[in-house]
């Protein structure tokens, strides 16, 4: 069996790891360190570590791989292939050179578009109608190696980061399973990326999460679904942050300053943008409160909202 080092961290990576465990010999798993989670800051292992522990696989968790003791230990292993999927760190050249068959990455975009750490978020924020999975050889430069295989998938109007993450996670494992035989046998024909067509999806920053109501409704809608269910787009109402998990676009002929609540229905809070498409907030969370449907919030506040300004 092919001896593989797997490197990954979040839920996206777990389906790939499960497939590799079933089909090959995973001799080591490298993931990020445990992190404090929640209000009580409970130290929590990353999803990939939980899978590795279930199968009693050796786990390495360097804070930074370059120059680490864990790297020195990995370099002593007899390995055929390194597979990464959303690991979260660049690999040192010494590690890239270690496996006999090279190092490959499962990336959640149609490269060269959306290189970087947040390709699913950015594709939805940009209003793309499709994205996909790329299996590529790894090089020193971020997400720039030769493409081995790709498969596209449609982004539906009602998709958000959560739904696309789940679809792409399954697609990534399936495409890798199809692609691995040609990599192992040395029969694949990889294709260089066209760097002139490269775009980048940097990790989401806090300032990327705030909604600018002065944009067209479609852009606001795409931002909301491109950040849901994490890290979540937000606005401010009455000096209180308001997270928006779900919304829809509605046509309006009411002319109002962008960010103004122009109407409420039984199920939504309708907010003006800078064009004739308003945003209907359906699922929300006020700071310090539990997440709730707008319908539940409106049962006690419907008559007091129209005319308020979100900023």
UniProtKB/Swiss-Prot annotation:
Gene3D superfamilies from the xrefs?
Formyl transferase, C-terminal domain (3.10.25.10), Formyl transferase, N-terminal domain (3.40.50.170)
Family matches, as CDD domains: FMT_core_Met-tRNA-FMT_N (cd08646), Met_tRNA_FMT_C (cd08704)
Could you state a single Gene Ontology molecular function term? methionyl-tRNA formyltransferase activity
Designated name of the protein: Methionyl-tRNA formyltransferase
Q: What is its EC number?
A: 2.1.2.9
Which transformation does this protein catalyse, written as a reaction? L-methionyl-tRNA(fMet) + (6R)-10-formyltetrahydrofolate = N-formyl-L-methionyl-tRNA(fMet) + (6S)-5,6,7,8-tetrahydrofolate + H(+)
UniProt KW keywords: Protein biosynthesis, Transferase
Give the UniProt family note: Belongs to the Fmt family.
User: Has UniProt tagged this entry with the keyword Signal?
Assistant: no
Q: What does this protein do?
A: Attaches a formyl group to the free amino group of methionyl-tRNA(fMet). The formyl group appears to play a dual role in the initiator identity of N-formylmethionyl-tRNA by promoting its recognition by IF2 and preventing the misappropriation of this tRNA by the elongation apparatus.
Query: What are its GO cellular component terms?
Result: cytosol
Q: Which residues bind (6S)-5,6,7,8-tetrahydrofolate?
A: 109-112
The keyword Disulfide bond is assigned to this record? no
- What PROSITE patterns does UniProt report for this protein, alphabetically? GART
Q: Which gene encodes it?
A: fmt
Catalytic EC class: transferase
Q: Which HAMAP family match?
A: Formyl_trans
Q: Which InterPro entries match?
A: Fmt, Formyl_trans_C, Formyl_trans_C_sf, Formyl_transf_N, Formyl_transf_N_sf, Formyl_transferase-like_C_sf, GART_AS, Met-tRNA-FMT_C
**One Pfam match:** Formyl_trans_N
């Amino acid at each position: 069996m092919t001896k593989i080092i797997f490197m990954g961290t979040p839920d996206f990576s777990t389906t790939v790891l499960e497939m590799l465990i079933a089909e090959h010999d995973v001799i080591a798993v490298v993931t990020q360190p445990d992190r404090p989670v929640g209000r009580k800051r409970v130290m929590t292992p990353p999803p990939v570590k939980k899978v590795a522990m279930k199968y009693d696989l050796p786990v390495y968790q360097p804070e930074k791989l370059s120059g680490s003791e864990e790297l020195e230990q990995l370099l002593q292993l007899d390995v055929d292939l390194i597979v990464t999927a959303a690991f979260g760190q660049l690999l040192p050249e010494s590690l890239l050179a270690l496996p006999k068959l090279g190092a490959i990455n499962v990336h959640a975009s149609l490269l060269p578009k959306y290189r970087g750490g947040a390709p699913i978020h950015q594709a939805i924020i940009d209003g793309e109608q499709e994205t996909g999975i790329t299996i590529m050889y790894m090089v020193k430069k971020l997400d720039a190696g030769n493409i081995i295989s790709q498969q596209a998938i449609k982004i539906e109007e009602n998709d958000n980061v959560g739904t696309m993450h789940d679809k792409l996670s399954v697609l990534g494992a399936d495409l890798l399973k199809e692609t691995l035989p040609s990599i192992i046998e040395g029969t694949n024909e990889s294709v260089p990326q066209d760097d002139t067509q490269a775009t980048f999806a940097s990790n989401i920053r806090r300032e990327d999460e705030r909604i600018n109501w002065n944009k067209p409704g479609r852009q606001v809608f795409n931002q909301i679904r491109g950040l849901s269910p994490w890290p979540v787009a937000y606005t401010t109402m009455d000096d209180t942050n308001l997270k928006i998990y779900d919304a829809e676009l509605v046509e309006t002929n009411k002319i109002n300053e962008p960010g103004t609540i122009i109407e409420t229905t039984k199920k939504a809070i309708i907010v003006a943008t800078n064009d004739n498409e308003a945003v209907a907030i359906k699922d929300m969370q006020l700071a310090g409160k539990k997440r709730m449907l707008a319908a539940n919030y409106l049962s006690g506040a419907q008559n007091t909202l129209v005319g308020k300004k979100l900023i």
